[in-house]
């Protein structure tokens, strides 16, 4: 019964909520696929990207996990007190109990209706008969589900934390909600409480899922009862996950991307062109290009004019010089926009 409850909870409640977030993030990525943005690695300015491509990173991760979830079958038992069909075979020895159990459990898959979702049409979880068990089905298939949900929760935690930072930097604006208290002491504040609430609930859910994964695969000899009290709490982990999803959706409904602020941050960080310059100079056989760029940029506040002065004084072809002078932080985003355009959001 727990296996069927997990299947139905994931198929009918959890996955539709995850897909709702998936769709919102995908549309956000498409909408801002060409919005040039300063990347940060180790918290420091790095090669420019686009806002849409960075959101798509999370979308793609979610897609991969949802596809993995679709490969999981929850195993069920129907084979007697210690897994040998003892009583069944003793009373009706002529009956094919193994085949009967297989067919009966497989019939539960007929109950699964398609998902009404533009990205995913097939509900991910199905059930299958496990003919080789002790008194209990070993729960390993439950744990694969829990690990899958946990990874999705981690991905969404990562997104919530990044969004929190973008809000802090002013790159994302939050719409004030009438009647909502931002801070008990500072009336001006609009705090990112929905993203923080999502992060906290995903942490609670995953702490429980991690314990389930450690505990439920272990049972003394043919069975002990320690799994029983643990299984009664599986719903709590799903509940915290659902609160996290709802909080994240609420937060997404109150934000808008501040394109001007994102553009300003990138335009005032021209040092990110150092990568472009040093690679083109290397291709042009300029001596020690990395060191030359490091000398004018590392630990210094540079301007676009500093790069232009370097380019003008280089012994390179006019074509290379023109390419260097035309480069700007806003245009140095590689194929980021194209990556978003070519992404297939359908989950097979």
What are these regions (language model features)?
Residues 1-348:
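Conserved, well-structured ligand/cofactor-binding cores
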């Amino acid at each position: 019964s727990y296996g069927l409850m997990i299947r139905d909870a994931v198929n009918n409640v959890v996955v539709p909520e995850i897909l709702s977030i998936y769709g919102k993030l995908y549309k956000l990525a498409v909408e801002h696929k060409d919005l040039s943005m300063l990347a940060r690695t180790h918290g420091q300015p790095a090669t420019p990207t686009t806002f849409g491509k960075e959101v798509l990173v999370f979308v793609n991760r979610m897609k991969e996990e949802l596809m993995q979830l679709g490969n999981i079958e929850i195993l069920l038992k129907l084979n007697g007190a210690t897994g040998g069909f003892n009583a069944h075979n003793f009373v009706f020895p002529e009956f094919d109990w193994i085949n009967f159990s297989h067919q009966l459990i497989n019939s539960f898959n007929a109950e699964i209706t398609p998902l009404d979702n533009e990205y995913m049409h097939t509900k991910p979880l199905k059930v299958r008969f496990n003919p080789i068990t002790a008194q209990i089905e070993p729960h390993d298939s439950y744990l694969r589900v829990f690990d899958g949900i946990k990874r999705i929760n981690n991905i969404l935690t990562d997104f919530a934390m990044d969004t929190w930072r973008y809000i802090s930097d002013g790159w994302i604006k939050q719409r004030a909600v009438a009647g909502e208290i931002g801070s008990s002491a500072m009336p001006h504040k609009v705090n990112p409480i929905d993203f923080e609430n999502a992060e906290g609930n995903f942490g609670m859910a995953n702490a429980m899922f991690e314990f389930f994964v450690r505990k439920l695969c272990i049972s003394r000899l043919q069975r002990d009862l320690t799994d029983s009290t643990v299984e009664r709490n599986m719903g709590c982990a799903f509940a915290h996950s659902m609160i996290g999803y709802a909080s994240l959706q609420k937060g997404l409904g109150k934000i808008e991307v501040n394109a001007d602020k994102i553009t300003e941050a990138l335009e005032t960080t021209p040092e990110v062109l150092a990568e472009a310059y040093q690679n083109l100079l290397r291709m042009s056989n300029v001596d020690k290009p990395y060191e030359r760029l490091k000398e004018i940029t590392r630990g210094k506040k540079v301007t676009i004019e500093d790069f232009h002065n370097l380019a003008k004084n280089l012994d390179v072809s006019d074509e290379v010089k023109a390419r260097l002078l035309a480069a700007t932080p806003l245009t140095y985003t590689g194929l980021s926009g194209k990556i978003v355009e070519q992404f297939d959001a359908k989950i097979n």
